[in-house]
Amino acid sequence: MSVVGTPKSAEQIQQEWDTNPRWKDVTRTYSAEDVVALQGSVVEEHTLARRGAEVLWEQLHDLEWVNALGALTGNMAVQQVRAGLKAIYLSGWQVAGDANLSGHTYPDQSLYPANSVPQVVRRINNALQRADQIAKIEGDTSVENWLAPIVADGEAGFGGALNVYELQKALIAAGVAGSHWEDQLASEKKCGHLGGKVLIPTQQHIRTLTSARLAADVADVPTVVIARTDAEAATLITSDVDERDQPFITGERTREGFYRTKNGIEPCIARAKAYAPFADLIWMETGTPDLEAARQFSEAVKAEYPDQMLAYNCSPSFNWKKHLDDATIAKFQKELAAMGFKFQFITLAGFHALNYSMFDLAYGYAQNQMSAYVELQEREFAAEERGYTATKHQREVGAGYFDRIATTVDPNSSTTALTGSTEEGQFH
């Protein structure tokens, strides 16, 4: 009988946890025996997820910082990697707004089907794989790693610990490298820059993080787990049961039964310290781009956990020039990196790039017809000097790659797609 997929023994797993530097700062409340018990007799290999997680972990330690833009389509991710970015961010907000499986437009309130983000992860990985295949048959070595790691939004888990476990499983199966989980009540979940957020107790979020880690361990993938706290803005909490939350709870109740709690950086610090043993990175969601607040947060967390890596949302919800001058904006990410914010990302970059670029083209087209489109085409031609390739759209989506399949099957094929195409005739 084949031994492919045979799980590791509990002893092997425990040795890995004890000796691999990857796990030196990670606390698990379950045993290697628990993992083995949950694996069954065959463990499926998740190549893209494993590779992505390992690459992301290396980047976080080898690069000054890893920066990413939010993508909501496969082609967006391809252009990001072509342009030089090393990682991809996938925002639940963008999936809600324009990429979910229900086909509706939603605000960021966990209203879309829970398997939507894994589906977009799969779509992005498929697009990156196609770009890699095209590059290989063309002998194009300009991009070192087409399969850039994807960090995806697990939101508040769409329920309890079991929902988190299943969502993490689906993300890993789709090829995710890392996932983040926020400490909001899933049924009342809001975008970090909306009002009405309700926190869950600190211990309950530790269960979320533990469940996400357990799912990765059962899959035998070193997924990067990111803890997010919304305590900087949230003024409600479901319960006063956790002693760590009690110093911030005012004693007032709302008509829904929630407790009012003090928001600000102090509850964020308290929660970050509680989450640190269970998370590879910690993200404090903020309402403004504030370097001093970031420094205060970093120093407080690192005083107790000096090796703790942090993440920062350089959000489009900030009116950047209202808060910062040009010089501060230019050095913003570098200064964050010096504080330990190793993963920095613009969550909704894809939404804004897509909407503005199409509005700009459509406005010009409405006024000036073909002249507006030709201006876009000329900008594409000019961008080829910087590595842009999508001017040749047939090539970009793999017509040449599938011609190669056709001629491999039949070297004398007379039905290849690019031969005789307008692209071959006009774009060389």
UniProtKB/Swiss-Prot annotation:
Family: Belongs to the isocitrate lyase/PEP mutase superfamily. Isocitrate lyase family.
Encoding gene, per UniProt annotation: icl
Binding residues annotated for substrate, in chain numbering: S91, G92, W93, G192, H193, R228, N313, C314, S315, P316, S317, T347
Coiled coil: none
Enzymatic reactions: D-threo-isocitrate = glyoxylate + succinate
SUPFAM superfamilies assigned: Phosphoenolpyruvate/pyruvate domain (SSF51621)
Cofactor(s) needed: Mg(2+)
GO cellular component: cytosol; extracellular region; plasma membrane
Observed phenotype of the null mutant: Cells lacking this gene show an attenuated bacterial persistence and virulence in immune-competent mice without affecting bacterial growth during the acute phase of infection.
Quaternary structure, from the entry: Homotetramer.
Induction field: Activated by PrpR and repressed by RamB.
UniProt-recorded name of the protein: Isocitrate lyase
Organism: Mycobacterium tuberculosis (strain ATCC 25618 / H37Rv)
PROSITE patterns cross-referenced by the UniProt entry: ISOCITRATE_LYASE
Primary enzyme class: lyase
Keywords (A to Z) from UniProt: Glyoxylate bypass, Isopeptide bond, Lyase, Magnesium, Manganese, Metal-binding, Tricarboxylic acid cycle, Ubl conjugation
Active site: C191 (proton acceptor)
Pathway in which the depicted protein is active: Carbohydrate metabolism; glyoxylate cycle; (S)-malate from isocitrate: step 1/2
